[in-house]
């Protein structure tokens, strides 16, 4: 009963609202986002390409207003900058200081309660969580899209890909399972399937936060396990719940698990991703789904199945290796 209640749309939305207000009234969180050069510059380029003079824009979750400011520089008719936290007062002051406030209307409101007198040409947002869906992006965008977006309107960014990639960690970054530990003179291997260990290997045990420097290399050519187009999807229930994956190793190494990251796609030329192995987006973190260490040679096949209890909650995701 409790599990079903947690997975209901109403409760999911309420929990997401509570979490986001708490997190994004912390100025440090906004400082991290503003300091993320890849994030800021990609959004600036995408907005310059996709927002046109005369557009009506709604900026969902404006925070300190940086996306609304970029949008205002494109000579729109109006930008509605909305946020349900009081940080919007800071955004308003920043806009006034930068003399861009005349094109922006700041509204402290939950997006589901937003009512406008005109339809919008563009939904601008950064509702992207570390595991892509965990800031309730799909539900929030679809609600605005279905109520306010003009036919043929644009969602910026509108397409995404989720990756769970076989990865080798650095020796310093790898934490072996307890049964893999080689302690001089002691044997822990019997704990692998021991019933006494079972209660400690549930829920979030098989995934952990990964420091960016801990990832050494990917073992396969990256391929998304799923993609989503916010202009087309009717709800998060459209996304697959179970995804079998079969990957061929292109770079020999030790498979220590699966690295979780996402790609945000503005158009064919403007995109970014959160993989820690190249242009770093430090304001997003990465999870690792752990696996017993396995040495892989070029041409080997790594097979696994990814299942999603609730796409917005990584603690309900599971990975089973063949």
Predicted regions and their residues:
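Class I SAM-binding transferase module
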Residues: 2-60, 64-307, 311-322
């Amino acid at each position: 009963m409790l599990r079903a209640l947690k997975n209901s749309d109403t409760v999911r939305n309420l929990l997401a609202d509570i979490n986001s207000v708490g997190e994004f009234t912390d100025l440090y969180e906004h400082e991290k986002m503003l300091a993320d050069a890849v994030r800021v510059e990609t959004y600036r380029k995408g907005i310059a390409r996709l927002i046109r003079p005369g557009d009506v824009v709604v900026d969902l979750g404006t925070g300190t207003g940086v996306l609304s400011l970029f949008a205002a520089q494109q000579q729109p008719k109006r930008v509605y900058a909305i946020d349900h936290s009081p940080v919007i007062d800071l955004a308003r002051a920043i806009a006034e200081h930068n003399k861009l406030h005349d094109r922006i209307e700041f509204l402290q409101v939950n997006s589901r309660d937003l009512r406008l007198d005109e339809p919008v040409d563009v939904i601008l947002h950064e509702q992207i969580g570390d595991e892509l869906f965990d800031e309730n992006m799909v539900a929030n965008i679809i609600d605005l899209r279905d109520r306010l977006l003009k036919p043929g309107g644009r969602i910026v960014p509108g397409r995404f890909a989720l990756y769970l990639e076989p990865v080798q960690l650095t020796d310093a970054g790898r934490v072996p399972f307890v049964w893999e530990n080689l302690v001089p003179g002691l044997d822990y291997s019997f704990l692998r399937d021991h019933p006494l260990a079972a209660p400690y290997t549930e829920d979030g045990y098989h995934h952990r936060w990964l420091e960016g420097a801990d990832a050494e290399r990917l073992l396969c050519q990256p391929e998304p396990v799923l993609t989503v187009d916010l202009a087309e999807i009717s709800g998060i229930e459209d996304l697959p719940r179970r995804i079998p994956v079969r990957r061929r190793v292109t770079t020999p190494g030790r498979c220590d698990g699966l690295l979780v990251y996402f790609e945000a796609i503005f158009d064919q030329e403007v995109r970014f991703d959160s993989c820690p192995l190249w242009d770093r987006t430090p304001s997003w973190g990465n999870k690792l789904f752990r696996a017993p260490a396995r040495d892989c040679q070029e041409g080997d096949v790594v097979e696994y199945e990814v299942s999603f209890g609730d796409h917005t909650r990584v603690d309900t995701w599971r990975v089973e290796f063949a």
